[in-house]
Amino acid sequence: MPRVKRGVTARARHKKVLDQAKGYRGRRSKVYRIAKQAVMRAGQYAYRDRRNKKRVFRALWITRINAASREHGLTYSVFMNGLKRASIELDRKVLADMAVMDKPAFAAIVNQVKANIAA
């Protein structure tokens, strides 16, 4: 079997990792061994936070809906229960956007919910 010299593949692998570590501080962007660890850790953080982002945004939407519904005299839980009873199938993302951007439309929904709760 012929001898395999791995300089080309090693350099390519090192270059790939160092390119991913571009912008990191100090030796984290210059030294392969340290850059490799930094890139691995960055990947772990990215993986974790892609999942965490969903939780954070849902909490933000709930906070916004709660604030807007309290302006109309309803708590979040009563408002959401009223939506279910009124068969209004809007998700929290859309409701939160309405509460911030389109107050009259949100007020109309709140009025429908209030009518449904009273009945």
Curated annotation (Swiss-Prot):
GO terms for biological process: ribosomal large subunit assembly; translation. One of its GO terms (cellular component) is ribonucleoprotein complex. This is Large ribosomal subunit protein bL20. PANTHER family: 39S RIBOSOMAL PROTEIN L20. It comes from the Bacteria. Keywords: Ribonucleoprotein, Ribosomal protein, RNA-binding, rRNA-binding. Belongs to the bacterial ribosomal protein bL20 family. GO terms for molecular function: rRNA binding; structural constituent of ribosome. The gene is rplT. Pfam families: Ribosomal_L20 (PF00453). It comes from Janthinobacterium sp. (strain Marseille) (Minibacterium massiliensis). Coiled coil: none annotated. Binds directly to 23S ribosomal RNA and is necessary for the in vitro assembly process of the 50S ribosomal subunit. It is not involved in the protein synthesizing functions of that subunit.
